[in-house]
Amino acid sequence: MALTKPDVDVLVVGGGLGGLSTALFLARRGARVLLVERHASTSVLPKAAGQNPRTMELFRFGGVADEILATDDIRGAQGDFTIKVVERVGGRVPAQLRESFEELVGATEQCTPMPWALAPQDRVEPVLVAHAAKHGAEIRFATELTSFQAGDDGVTARLRDLGTGAESTVSARYLVAADGPRSAIRESLGITRHGHGTLAHFMGVIFEADLTAVVPPGSTGWYYLQHPDFTGTFGPTDRPNRHTFYVRYDPERGERPEDYTPQRCTELIRLAVDAPGLVPDILDIQAWDMAAYIADRWREGPVLLVGDAAKVTPPTGGMGGNTAIGHGFDVAWKLAAVLRGEAGERLLDSYGADGSLVSRLVVDESLAIYAQRMAPHLLGSVPEERGTAQVVLGFRYRSTAVAAEDDDPEPTEDPRRPSGRPGFRAPHVWIEQDGTRRSTVELFGDCWVLLAAPEGGAWGQAAARAARIWASASTSISSAAMSPPPPAN
C-alpha cells in the first residue's frame, strides 16, 4: 500500500475524553485531523467528573482551562468534599475518609499553579470539540469505522455515516484508536491485555429528585453504600437535584442487567436515601463492568491506542478520564514531532513505554482505593496506596526518549520535593520573566522549551539559531532566561 498524499495526517476513532484531547492537541500543532464518533453527539451523561491539577495544566496548554473552570458549577463546595462509607445516605457514618478537597489541595498546591476542578464529562467534551474545531480539526459524529488496512505508509479506513448509510474511504498517516475498553481496533490487531480483569458488575442510574432533606444543597460528598440488601455508591452532580446511583449486581447469583427496571431502581434508590415515598425521575440506566486492564502493546505500526482502549482502571480515585486526557496530550505532541520531521518513528515507541508505566501506577492506586472502600477482601493482594499527589504529579517517564542520568528504579517521587531529574514533570517554581511573576509550568505548551539560568546565554543563542533553522517547518522553539522572583510583599 502506498499513500503518497494521505487525506489527513491523523484519523482519530472515538470522541470521548481521550480522542477529543488527541484531536485538540494535534490540531493546535498544525496537524490535519479527522475525528469520527459513532454516537450522535458528545456524552449526555456526567460519567467521568473531576480534573486533577495535572489535567488542568494540560488544559491550560490546550487553551481550555478557563472555560473548563467556568463550567465547574460546584467548585465552590470543594472544601466540603468528603467520602463516607455508610449503610444509607444521611444515616450513621461508621467510616469517614478524610479526603476533602481542602486536604487534596494542601497536598498539591505547592506543586502546581493549577487548581483541582469538578467539571463533569458532559460539560467538558463540548469544550474540547469547539476548540479542536477552532484549530482546524474535523469532527464527525454519527460516523463509524467499518474497516481499515494498515501498512508502512499509513492507514486506509472505511467510514459509514450512520444517518445516511453512505460509506467513504479516508487515508491517514496515522490512526489513533480511542474507541473504548472493548476497542474493535485493538482486537483486530490482536493486541492482548493484562491485569486483574473484571472486578465487579454495576448498574449505573442517573435520576432527578429533591433530596435536600438528605443531601445538603451544594454538597459534593460521595457515599459508598454498604446496605444489607446491596452494595453501591451515591453522589450528586453539578445539576440541581440530579444524582448518580451505582448498584452492584452479581451474575453468579443469577442477577442480570435486565432485572434492573425503573421500578426496581426506584426501590433501591428509596432504600439508599431512606425515603420510602420518594418518586425519582429515572433518566438513564446502564450496565457497566469495573475492570483493570493494560494493553500489552500501545502501538502497532501506524496505529496507536489511547484512553480506555489502552488501559481500563477502576473509577475509584477518579483517575481514568484524567489519564485518557494525558494519553491524548502525549500521543499528540509525539505524532506532531514526527509529522513535522523533528523526530523519527522511534519516538512513537516511547509513547507506549511511558504510557503503560503511568497507567500501572494509576491502576494500582485505583485498585488500592477500591479495596479500601468497597472490597476489603482484596487488601493485601493489591499494592498499597502511594498517594494521589505522587501518582498525579510525581510520576517518571523512563523510555528511550528520556536522557536519564541515573538508574533509580523508583517510578515516582514526592512532587513537593522535586528533583528536576530527566523524566519527571518539570517542577513548579515561581520565576520572573519580563517583569512578570509566573510559574515555570506556564512556560510549556505547543513548542519545544529551553530553560536557562541568567548565565546560560550561550544556550539561549543556540535555541534562537535552531528556531531560525526550523522556522520553515512550522517548528517553534521557546527559550526562557529565568531569575528568582522578587520577594513577596
From Swiss-Prot:
Pathway: Antibiotic biosynthesis; daunorubicin biosynthesis; Antibiotic biosynthesis; carminomycin biosynthesis; Antibiotic biosynthesis; rhodomycin biosynthesis; Antibiotic biosynthesis; doxorubicin biosynthesis
Family of the protein in this entry: Belongs to the PheA/TfdB FAD monooxygenase family.
Further details from the record: S.peucetius subsp. caesius ATCC 27952, a mutant strain derived from S.peucetius ATCC 29050, is the only organism reported to produce doxorubicin in vivo.
Class of the enzyme per the UniProt entry, highest EC level: oxidoreductase
NCBIfam families, A to Z: AkvoneHdxseDnrF, AkvoneHdxseRdmE
Disruption phenotype: Cells lacking this gene do not produce epsilon-rhodomycinone and accumulate 11-deoxycarminomycin and 11-deoxydaunorubicin.
Gene3D superfamilies linked to this entry: 3.40.30.120, D-Amino Acid Oxidase, subunit A, domain 2, FAD/NAD(P)-binding domain
Record SUPFAM superfamilies: FAD/NAD(P)-binding domain
Keyword Transferase: no
Function per UniProt: Involved in the biosynthesis of the anthracyclines carminomycin, rhodomycin, daunorubicin (daunomycin) and doxorubicin (adriamycin) which are aromatic polyketide antibiotics that exhibit high cytotoxicity and are widely applied in the chemotherapy of a variety of cancers.
UniProt-listed Pfam families: FAD_binding_3 (PF01494)
Superkingdom assignment: Bacteria
Protein's name in the database: Aklavinone 12-hydroxylase DnrF
Binding-site positions, aklavinone: 317
Positions contributing to FAD binding: 17-18, 37, 121, 145, 308
Keywords, alphabetical: Antibiotic biosynthesis, FAD, Flavoprotein, NAD, NADP, Nucleotide-binding, Oxidoreductase
Record-level GO BP terms: daunorubicin biosynthetic process; doxorubicin metabolic process
Region (Disordered): 402-428
GO molecular function: FAD binding; oxidoreductase activity, acting on paired donors, with incorporation or reduction of molecular oxygen, NAD(P)H as one donor, and incorporation of one atom of oxygen
Cofactor(s) the protein requires to work: FAD
